[in-house]
Design a protein with these regions (language model features):
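Catalytic domains of carbohydrate-active enzymes, especially glycoside hydrolases
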Residues: 1-9, 113-118, 198-205
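Active-site-adjacent "subsite" loops/lids of carbohydrate-active enzymes
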Residues: 33-36, 46-47, 52-113
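Aromatic- and glycine-enriched glycan-recognition loops and surfaces
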Residues: 19-41, 152-157
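Substrate-binding cleft/loops of secretory-pathway carbohydrate-active enzymes
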Residues: 56, 168, 173-217, 223
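Aromatic- and acidic-residue-enriched segments that line the glycan-binding/catalytic groove
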Residues: 11-23, 53-86, 124-143
């Protein structure tokens, strides 16, 4: 269940503004309604989060100023470093501890306020391979391999989210739903092999195999077999993400 698509919240949040698709006078809690109805039917609900993707300039300018991301957008020392524009929208930069802490705090809030069964990251990590996205942070790091360094920043973010979930409620699952191909994940600096082979990053990987069996680039059966080879940690489960239109 998507609960945070663009630095917003389809639930009651201290850290994120109300969902962009919700009316200003919305008097109900969409997440709580879904949890109540789903649990009555014996269904589990995993809160689906986009941790880094934010909003367009027009939307950011309308964001209430009590929220951290709005404050960072208004701060010339944070806009362009902690928040970076790529394409037509802004993105959080996971290279900064303060950014990772906000993301972790948002997860803690979800797990402590709601009886969710899991938290899942969507397949949006670094939005670009362009070096200008995080030039300042990379220069300050002293690292020489940008690709490896970016993967480490994503790993730190993922670990922070995993730890936040487990500290709030060890029974709640934490999962990641990456892109369905290794090449797609490499472009986003998503270190899926580490996540599938090392404890402490996630409880499950759910790659988005939105491909048919006859797909010329990533046929379903062969791609699923590839993922089965990547998830070797006994603490990590592989679930295959499918879509209803395939």
């Amino acid at each position: 269940l998507q609960v945070r698509a663009f630095a917003d919240a389809y639930y009651t949040s201290t850290y994120y503004m109300s969902g962009l698709s919700m009316s200003a006078d919305c008097s109900f809690d969409p997440l709580q309604i879904m949890l109540t109805e789903a649990h009555q039917l014996g269904l589990s609900v995993h809160a689906w989060v986009n941790p880094l993707r934010c909003q367009t300039d027009a939307q950011m300018e309308q964001m209430p100023e009590q929220y951290p991301i709005s404050q960072w957008y208004a701060d010339e020392t944070k806009r362009g470093t902690w928040l970076v524009k790529s394409g037509d929208r802004w993105w959080l930069n996971p290279a900064y501890p303060e950014v990772r802490q906000l993301i972790a705090d948002g997860v803690t809030e979800l797990v402590t306020q709601y009886e969710i069964d899991g938290v899942q990251i969507d397949d949006y990590f670094y939005p670009t391979t362009d070096a200008s996205f995080d030039a300042a942070a990379f220069a300050e790091s002293g690292a020489s391999d940008r690709s490896a360094w970016r993967k480490e920043q994503c790993n730190l973010m993922v670990q922070a989210m995993y730890n936040a979930v487990k500290q709030a409620n060890p029974k709640v699952l934490f999962g990641i739903s990456p892109q369905g191909t290794l090449s797609g994940n490499e472009k986003q600096s998503a270190d899926v092999q580490t996540w599938g082979q090392t404890a402490g990053y996630c409880d499950y990987l759910l790659p988005q195999l939105y491909f048919g069996f006859q797909n010329s680039t990533a046929p379903f059966a062969e791609t699923a077999a590839f993922w089965a080879e990547q998830v070797t940690c006994p603490d990590v489960t592989l679930w295959i993400g499918i879509c209803t239109y395939k």
